[in-house]
């Protein structure tokens, strides 16, 4: 792969510069990056709505809320723990990731749904999405929930993963 070769070239170039052999540095290979997912991996709005509908019909409200939160806010799966009971009051979550703070706005419809969800689930403090030990859900549980609902909704599992819901948010 060109990107792997470029990594080696960068390492060699750094060594050459450290040794003051600047004339030995070589150019990296130009790589054309694709801006979008291949169409066969792109989740459509229709498929997303089917996932949510099936989750609700299966009485799997946690998965339905999870889908709507990931798609409605564009957050990363690792940032889900910052969606907590306190932030539902103001509709804003401060996410600390990669050394930065980002302010996530919760759409009012999602905010209302999440408030109802935490009330029905008797979640008083902490993360909205908790495991059975009242700890924030980890990425493995999120993935398994999404794959399970994809099978029930007859949506290709190749298309259903947390980051693809982030892309859906960016496209809509």
Question: Which stretches of residues belong to each language-model region?
Answer:
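Conserved catalytic core of the tyrosine transesterase superfamily
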Residues: 1-172
């Amino acid at each position: 792969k060109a990107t792997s070769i470029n990594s080696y070239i960068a390492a060699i170039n750094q060594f050459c510069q450290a040794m003051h052999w600047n004339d030995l540095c070589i150019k990296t290979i130009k790589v054309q990056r694709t801006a979008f997912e291949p169409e066969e991996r792109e989740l459509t709005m229709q498929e997303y709505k089917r996932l949510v509908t099936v989750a609700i019909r299966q009485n799997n409200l946690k998965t339905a809320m999870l889908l709507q939160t990931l798609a409605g806010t564009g957050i990363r799966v690792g940032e889900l723990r910052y969606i907590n009971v306190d932030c539902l009051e103001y509709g804003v979550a401060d996410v600390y990731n990669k050394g930065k703070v980002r302010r996530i706005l919760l759409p009012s419809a999602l905010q209302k749904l999440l408030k109802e969800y935490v009330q029905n689930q008797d979640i008083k403090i902490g993360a909205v999405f908790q495991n059975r030990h009242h700890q924030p859900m980890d990425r493995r549980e999120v993935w398994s929930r999404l794959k399970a609902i994809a099978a029930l909704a007859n949506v290709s599992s190749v298309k259903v993963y947390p980051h693809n819901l982030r892309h859906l948010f960016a496209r809509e």
